[in-house]
Amino acid sequence: MHTHLPPLDPLPDGNNPPQNVPERSDVFAAGRSFPSNIVSFDLLDNHINIFYQLASSSGLLFDGAAAGAADPDSVPDYWGCAAPGGACDEGFHITLRSDNRFDIRGVSQVYPDCSGNKSNSILSQEAAARTYDIPANGIIFLKNTLWIDGQINNSRATILAFAEPIVGGEADINLNNDLLYTDYEGADAIGLIAQRDVNAGQYSADIIRVDAAIIAKTGRIGRNYYGSACANYIRSTITIYGSLATSQRYGFAYTDGTGYQIRNLIYDNHLTFSPPPHYPSTGEYTFISWDEK
């Protein structure tokens, strides 16, 4: 944990763990403790298998490449995207709704790369959406890249993007528009788990808010580098309310001033006792004493 709120934390001193680190209780109310135990992202493999089973049995599993043939658990069975250029060749776009449902469209084309990096932005998609109820167990599993936005109200869902092979594939989750709760007292919860990266794309909103607990299993949470020759190379503000777990270094901005100028990261305390459905954790909180005055 490091802070740039004045006075800035000292630079790393070469020791592991660092020595003579100031307490900074004004920023870290519970203090700072070094070192922390390493948690391997490989431990998620078993969780992903469980999510797949839950989606297949009583949740929703979308497999555009299989289209209900090679993967009989997939819905809808009339979605044929196996051929290049198919209706969901690039992935799926989900818009969550406030009536405990969601709209889903196949994404057929994305904007071209810029500065040698993927735009992670939709150029064309199906005009008509298909609408589904959020399943009772809250699990939605997509076997392709996902774009997601919208707003929920009294809903809870964990949504995963994992392509074949499940261990070693490269599906991403892209966040280019607001993804919001209505209730901020714990009734609403969204979990997002990406096989690789969780991105804010080149054409992401100038001001964007994402309410979710987010995991990037093998990649990073952030935004690709887009130089000054790219459209939207500078964005204003991104706010994430929830939690971040990223295998590689997080970042929505770069040292040359590109990317999001303001990054607000706010931990959702309700995740402690009311996480999204079946969301992975490394343990549970316990009360060791209680004192009423």
Question: What are the language-model segments listed below?
Answer:
Residues 1-173, 180-204, 208, 215-293:
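C-terminal globular interaction/adhesion domains in large, modular proteins
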